[in-house]
Curated annotation (Swiss-Prot):
Domain Histidine kinase: 351-589
Keyword Transmembrane recorded: yes
Enzyme Commission number(s): 2.7.13.3
Protein family according to the UniProt entry: Belongs to the ethylene receptor family.
Keyword tags: ATP-binding, Copper, Disulfide bond, Endoplasmic reticulum, Ethylene signaling pathway, Kinase, Membrane, Metal-binding, Nucleotide-binding, Phosphoprotein, Receptor, Transferase, Transmembrane, Transmembrane helix, Two-component regulatory system
Superkingdom of origin organism: Eukaryota
Encoding gene, per UniProt annotation: ERS2
Free-text remark on how the cofactor is bound: Binds 1 copper ion per dimer.
Name of the protein in question: Probable ethylene response sensor 2
Organism: Oryza sativa subsp. japonica
Pfam assignment, any one: HisKA
Principal location: endoplasmic reticulum
Binding site for Cu cation: 66, 70
Length: 635
């Protein structure tokens, strides 16, 4: 070896086999070290969000230096110069520095990398949870779709049996069931009867006692209840399982407001009755009931209950409609019969009206002719009384016979000025013969403030007073009858039993108050509500005091037309009776000054009854058994 060469000899010979392997290994190590930084550079370029770029730069420098060290080491397997040794030393020193710095930086980076791993796991868990939630959402959507479909099918009809059949078929198709059945309560309510199935129709009619523990368990829960496949409720099909028995669930179906639910003599069901729906999965399938399937069954059971209640309401409506049609037909027939009866009655009344008016006109004509002759004062008074009675009888005949006019409310008042005091005088002249026959005293008292003239219907007013006073005389055997007339005070216009009567006091009008008091048989509290009814007779009236029973009823109608009020008061049987009525009359603007105002005075029953030359007259009561009262003239 040349002494002038500053070279370093290797530790092994160049042709040594180990040296060759090391040479080759260093070459490939250097090649790998130089390729790794290129891959890191490509990764950093593609990853725009990588947070540790400077760390990768340090790794790249470390790897490049390591590769350079191995590459320089290739020249050390042969004789090499000292320059190569210096370069190798510098490369190793730089590699040591960079590797130490990188190692120190990893102390701070590794915890962050661990956190990244934890976050990755957390995100995976969240992703799994989201997947589960999405599965639940998809399941709910599927359940909702099936429920919507089933609801549409159920509500497409309001026939109960169609609803139940459709429900079972659609549930069996949607849930892929081996069998689905419905148990309904029997007529006695002590058992459940199988009414509907999908496949095994031969089992329909089977009966299960309602007091079984499994039935009570289903009734006491509004959720799906799992029942054994050996339960009597599950005996809806033959057991064909060879390995795994089928899972069976049951749920109650409220029968809401069902009546007359007839199938195989089913009873009338109340709102607390329940049916039981049983659902069976296919056997040997190892399939279990999932939560969304249970939820679907619960929702469908509620929808079936609502649909059944709607169907029941429709059936009740149809039955009510049919009943109403039958009643309308019956009412129409009754209306036609009533119209025929009314026509016949009107014809009869028209004939009777004509036949009664003929003799009445003769009486009026003869009485008018008698007034034109020379009569005494007493005779003239009697003939005038006959004329007034005939006129009043004509009015009564018009009212009683023209029933249709009274019933349809077409009766109208004849408003005209009249002498109010003379009206009471005429009433006394009409009732005093009957009172004299029964030896009753009649007292008439007119208040000083009572006007002489008034405006109203004199005939109706006179008829009211005659009906009330005549009624008092009729039911009084002994004693007296008093008639008092005055102007009513506004606070006294409402009777004790008429809270809805509201009189209206206005200028130009006044209310006439008339009180008729007797000492007769009185009225019992039981008969008081019936006194103003047509053809009503008190039980204590007796057979001699029975009239037509129209007087008070007509009087009440006339008082109502005159915007008044009428009522009776009695302390009981045998204690007399007091009749009070108010009528609204007009006040004349210019009363006749030539007429003298009548002062209140008592009238005796025999006043004007006739003197020794009185004309023979007769006053007839409505009862034909009452004897006639005659006043004979002297011969």
């Amino acid at each position: 070896m040349d002494g002038s060469c500053d070279c370093i000899e290797p530790l092994w010979q160049a042709d040594d086999l180990l040296v060759k392997y090391q040479y080759i290994s260093d070459f490939f190590i250097a090649l790998a070290y130089f390729s790794i930084p290129l891959e890191l550079i490509y990764f950093v370029k593609k990853s725009a969000f990588f947070p540790y770029r400077w760390v990768l730069i340090q790794f790249g420098a470390f790897i490049v230096l390591c590769g350079a060290t191995h590459l320089i080491n290739l020249w050390t397997f042969a004789i090499y110069t000292k320059t190569i040794a210096v370069v190798l030393t510098v490369a190793k020193a730089a590699t040591a520095v960079v590797s130490c710095i990188t190692a120190l930086m990893l102390v701070h980076i590794i915890p962050d990398l661990l956190n990244v791993k934890l976050r990755e796991r957390f995100l995976k868990d969240k992703a799994d949870e989201l997947d589960r939630e999405m599965g639940i959402i998809r399941t709910q959507e599927e359940t909702g779709r099936h429920v919507h479909m089933l609801t549409h099918e159920i509500r497409s009809t309001l026939d109960r049996h169609t609803i139940l059949r459709t429900t079972l078929v659609e549930l069996g198709r949607t849930l892929v069931l081996a069998e689905c059945a419905l148990w309904m309560p029997t007529r006695s309510g002590s058992a459940l009867q199988l009414s509907h199935t999908i496949y095994n129709s031969a089992a329909i009619g089977s009966v299960v006692p309602i007091n079984l523990p499994i039935v009570s368990k289903v009734f006491n829960s509004n959720r799906v209840v799992k029942i054994p496949h050996t339960s009597p409720l599950a005996s809806i099909t033959a057991d064909k399982s060879r390995y795994v028995p089928p899972e069976v669930v049951a749920i109650r179906v409220p029968l809401l407001h069902l009546t007359n639910f007839q199938i195989n003599d089913w009873p009338e069901l109340s709102a607390k009755s329940f049916a039981v729906m049983v659902l069976m999965l296919p056997p040997d399938s190892a399939r279990e009931w999932r939560p969304h399937e249970r939820e679907l069954v619960e929702v469908v059971a509620d929808q079936v209950a609502v649909a059944l209640s709607h169907a029941a309401i429709l059936e009740e409506s149809m039955r009510a409609r049919d009943l109403l049609m039958e009643q309308n037909i019956a009412l129409d027939a009754a209306r036609r019969e009533a119209e025929m009866a009314i026509c016949a009655r009107n014809d009869f009344l028209a004939v009777m009206n004509h036949e009664m008016r003929t003799p009445m006109r003769a009486i009026v004509s003869l009485s008018s002719l008698l007034l034109e002759t020379n009569l005494s004062a007493e005779q003239r008074l009697m003939v005038e009384t006959i004329l007034k009675s005939s006129d009043l009888l004509a009015t009564l005949t018009n009212d009683v016979l023209d029933v249709s006019k009274l019933e349809n409310g077409s009766l109208e008042l004849e408003i005209a000025p009249f002498n109010l005091h003379s009206t009471f005088t005429d009433v006394v002249n009409l009732i005093k013969p009957v009172a004299a026959c029964k030896r009753l005293s009649v007292m008439v008292t007119l208040a000083p403030e009572l006007p002489l003239h008034a405006i109203g219907d004199q005939k109706r007013l006179m008829q009211i007073i005659l009906n009330v006073a005549g009624n008092s005389i009729k039911f009084t055997k002994e004693g007296h009858v008093s008639i008092t007339a005055s102007m009513a005070r506004p606070d006294a216009l409402r009777g004790p039993h008429e809270p809805d009567y509201h009189p209206v006091v206005s200028d130009g009008f006044f209310y006439l108050a008339v009180q008729v008091k007797d000492t007769g048989c009185g009225i019992s509290p039981q008969d008081m509500p019936h006194t103003f009814r047509k053809f009503a007779h008190p039980e204590n009236a007796g057979k001699w005091n029975s009239g037509s029973g129209l007087g008070l009823a007509l009087s009440r109608r006339f008082v109502s037309l005159m915007e008044g009020n009428i009522w009776l008061e009695s302390e009981g049987v045998g204690k007399g009776c007091t009749a009070m009525f108010f009528v609204k009359l007009g006040m004349p603007e210019k009363p006749n000054a030539n007429l003298r105002r009548m002062a209140p005075h008592p009238l005796q029953p025999n006043q004007g009854a006739g003197g020794p030359d009185a004309l023979s007259i007769s006053i007839m009561d409505s009862n034909p058994r009452v004897p006639r009262v005659r006043y004979q003239s002297s011969v």
